[in-house]
């Protein structure tokens, strides 16, 4: 599913909302999650999961095409940990 499909589903389930309003709401939610992560904060959505950032330290890597050793810089990456309700639903529990 892509963002536009999510917007269409939410708009169809909420006919009292205009699609442009749903686009703005979904965009605002994603923006706030992104802003919180950029500030180093954790975003927890109970029952769904938690977004956080983790540090990947610098390391030596290898170019698969040439075999040459390259230095990979330290970086921060997004991380998602599923919540219990989501995990249970995916595994068939009710």
Swiss-Prot record:
Annotated GO MF terms: DNA binding; structural constituent of chromatin
UniProt key word Transcription: yes
GO terms for cellular component: chromosome; cytosol
Gene Ontology biological process terms from the UniProt entry: DNA recombination; regulation of DNA-templated transcription; regulation of translation
Gene3D superfamilies: IHF-like DNA-binding proteins
Keyword match Repeat: no
Keyword terms of this UniProt record: DNA recombination, DNA-binding, Transcription, Transcription regulation, Translation regulation
Taxonomy, superkingdom: Bacteria
Subunit structure as annotated in this protein's UniProt entry: Heterodimer of an alpha and a beta chain.
NCBIfam families: hip (TIGR00988), PRK00199.1 (NF001222)
Function: This protein is one of the two subunits of integration host factor, a specific DNA-binding protein that functions in genetic recombination as well as in transcriptional and translational control.
HAMAP family given in the database record: IHF_beta
Family that this chain belongs to: Belongs to the bacterial histone-like protein family.
PANTHER family, per the entry: DNA-BINDING PROTEIN HU, INTEGRATION HOST FACTOR SUBUNIT BETA
Name assigned to this protein: Integration host factor subunit beta
Source species: Brucella melitensis biotype 2 (strain ATCC 23457)
Lineage: Bacteria, Pseudomonadati, Pseudomonadota, Alphaproteobacteria, Hyphomicrobiales
